[in-house]
């Protein structure tokens, strides 16, 4: 086992990068440090005027920005640039999301800089955005989490804070037994001039097993959920015989990693109704179908130990769930507030306990 104790260190990163990865480890602990970026990829602006002639806004002092060659607002930093035309609106004094605003469309056609660092967008019109409203201008690009865990066993994160990441705060896949104690995705206190934290989920667990234990955390200002726990389904694309199928990853951001191994227990889900169909089965053999190796593969050829139920075909739409890679979840004594989307998402057939959490102005 390895313990990384930051002793209160505040790690500030630059450009576009993945701050910390923990891969193929066992009995490791990360504790007592924080992660942030000098120049976030989200551009925070304040509404100065809003009316029939459009919106006038001023970027926050740390935002590096310009009008690009297409005439759009563009934020930039070391090795990156971004021209957002969407955003999330926050109340100036409370840092809560503006009621019933959801994802904003912020068109920048015809943008003009009417005085130093003050811009007028004539096509951006929204009566809900009163002067003083703070908008986090953003794209939906999320290339890197703050912390990435993969193929780890018995991992503990204690007193770790992620103040910003251009993706999830914590992304874990194919891990067994993860404990979060005082892990937070949060602002730097009440006087932090920022209104946002991460570009996506605060914590995200994909195809993990064992137990996910998350407690005593603060999750605020993120552009998605506080926690999302799920497996990764494959869709049956071809039914070759009563034991064999070709199945495919369907989400464009979820492929190229090991979906399962020989002996894994699976079940089948009818996509139209989310009902289980047939009995449980086991993988006898699984091979990448569209690549020579698992890396980069989107399709697998899977042979099952037992015959498939007659209802399971490639005509209707069936997903395969790997039961050997599903976790129990304990989520307790956390605060979730002032975020886009939902508070918590749990998609696991195993025991899930959610208790003593405070949900304060989650917008989804």
Please describe what each predicted stretch is.
Residues 13, 37-39, 58-112, 255-295:
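Ser/Thr/Gly-rich low-complexity blocks that favor extended beta-strand/coil architectures
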Residues 90-142, 277-329, 337:
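Small/polar beta-strand repeat architecture
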Residues 1-3, 12-31, 36-54, 141-153, ...:
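Extracellular beta-strand-rich solenoid/capping regions of secreted or surface-exposed proteins
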Residues 175-211, 238-254, 356-364:
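Long amphipathic alpha-helical scaffold regions
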Residues 27-32, 42-54, 236-261, 265:
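Surface beta-strand/loop "capping" patches
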Residues 13-19, 39-43, 143-146, 166-172, ...:
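Short glycine/acidic-rich loop motifs that flank beta-strands on beta-rich extracellular proteins
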Residues 207-221:
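Repeat-solenoid scaffold signature
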